[in-house]
Amino acid sequence: MGLAMTNSAAALALSARSVTHRFGDVVALDGVSLDIPEGEATAIVGESGSGKTTLLRCFNRLVEPDTGEIIVGDRDVRVQSPVELRRSIGYVQQHGGLLPHWRVLRNVALVPVLRGMRDAHDAARHALDLVGLPAADFGSRFPHELSGGQRQRVALARSIAARPGVILLDEPFGALDAISRSELQESFVGLRRELTLTTLLVTHDLAEAGRLGDQVVVMRKGKIEQRGPMRALVQSPATDYVARLIEKARAGLEPLLA
């Protein structure tokens, strides 16, 4: 199934062009093409093994495509330093990845310090304020002194502290309880709009994809089955697989479509 075309007038922040990747004999990505305009939130959803995390990790070179091109901004990632590329893109994982023996403020200031920002610690304090964890109250704590939701807020603060234009999120809220997850989703939507961030989110939860993504991409067996706004996917599923996913998630989708 081919992709729905994006707005050609919008500058592209991220682009995958006919990307393939194998893990041994397993085809993880099979000719995937995807354009994400600046400022858009795109959510990739699919079952385990669909290729969604592999595709996301191509954009910060944690995975190198076998063939095809990955473009960040207007440059092929292969001509960019992996270290500098990763420092220029925010990245949030499911379990946060915080350094356990560093206090919260130092964790958040890590990338600004590495990038040589003169106001690194001020930037970290501002990022903590944006996620609702003021540095005066939380900056001196260690990660183990925080709740799961608070740790993910710190991880989100760290991802935006160096003021990136792009953030990649790999199942960022998947390990949280339902209340913490809902609160953090709401905070993230407001934060993304305030900072005009381009975001690429991977999730197994179709309702979460609909809440957080302007566009939703459904992947299966290394290919894109369908792309579009959640309402369009629900109204006109392109394949039986997409229709089955929607039916399983219908109860969670109803509030989004009311």
Q: Can you describe what each PLM-predicted range is?
A:
Residues N60:
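Helix-to-loop junction immediately C-terminal to a conserved catalytic motif
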Residues D76-G90, L114, L233-P237:
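ABC ATPase NBD coupling module
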Residues Q80-P82, W102, R106-H121, D129-G132:
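ABC-type ATPase nucleotide-binding domains, specifically the catalytic core motifs of the NBD
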Residues F142-L146, Q150:
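Conserved ABC ATPase signature
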Residues A161-G165:
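A short, proline-enriched helix->beta-strand linker immediately N-terminal to the Walker B motif
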Residues K221-G222:
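Conserved ABC ATPase "signature" C-loop
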Residues R227-G228, S236:
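ABC ATPase "signature
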